[in-house]
Amino acid sequence: VRSSAASDVYKRQIGIMLGHFLPGMKEALNHLEYAGISIPMAVLIWIMIYPMMMKVDFKSIKNIGKNPKGLFVTWIVNWLIKPFTMYGIASFFFFVVFKTWITPDFATEYLAGAVLLGAAPCTAMVFVWSTLTKGNPAYTVVQVASNDIIILFAFVPIVKFLLGVSNVSVPFQTLFMSVVLFVVIPLAAGIITRLLVVRKKGTEYFEQTFLHKFDSATTVGLLLTLILIFMFQGEVVLDNPLHIILIAVPLIIQTFFIFFLAFGVCRIIRLPYDIAAPAGMIGASNFFELAVAVAVALFGTSSPAALATTVGVLTEVPVMLTLVKIANKLKEKFKYE
């Protein structure tokens, strides 16, 4: 654990140094985006989730209706609990615990950024966390796809209700591109690859040999993703060290709380581990591309609200990797008699 934590610190330091000392490289990569989505980040996410998508068997997708409890847990936690606990936890810390260091105006915008993060469950990275916890690939795809559909009609009303902001709108281009880039394209590529390899060399070769060629893809992709995030956001960290820490506290507490809530409920209702782990991960992680896009549109690029969503990006990978370790250690608890 110590070596892993040290490794994470080194990756962050490398990213910050690259962004600081090679601003030209950072600027070039920053320009490679479409609809608010970073193309380099998209490529790295593809590298991480493509192996999982190859494991998706459409026959198993048809059988998900026989065990819908995992979907119900995901929907209830993500939409009826998570946005409101985020509002409560963030309000308590920004307006009460940290009032000595954060002015009311800043606290209000930090709260807005936190709520934007809490109101949209993750799309792309859930596939990575599911892979690392050996989650059910087909079930994870349905969990993510169904939540993306709910975002279309639930995100705006929830944000308006919690923040009292009237001019909230979903950047549909960002949402659409995220679904296409992180669900449709890798899923199609994975299924086509599976069909072609199985047809040519058989199921045994595909499962025992071919899939293992991609065993290190997720690890390499995660390492590069962490470096890239801290390269993009390095200046933010260096310019606002205290506020970064203060914003991170409620975000991290919320992440752990939502994970253990969903994961624990799955244990109580006796769901298998490969459904429970992704159910906990999808609620714990956030759709930060969407949150950042809305924060920038509502409050501006250099606003405290945008900074809060950026902190969500910074904390996402290290915190979720910790939850992956915890989930894997608790796997034995999901063996029922």
Regions inferred by a protein language model and the residue ranges of each:
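Structural signature of hydrophobic alpha-helical transmembrane segments
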Residues: A35-I49, D105-A120, L175-A188, H243-T255, ...
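Interfacial helix-loop-helix linkers and transmembrane-helix boundary segments
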Residues: A28-Y34, M54-T74, T133, V170, ...
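Membrane-water interface at loop-to-transmembrane-helix junctions
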Residues: S7, V170-F182, E204-T225, Q233, ...
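Entry/N-cap segments of selected transmembrane alpha helices
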Residues: S60-A90, F94, L175-V179, F232-A262, ...
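The feature identifies polytopic integral membrane transport proteins across all domains of life
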Residues: N67-W75, V96-L117, G135-A145, Y205, ...
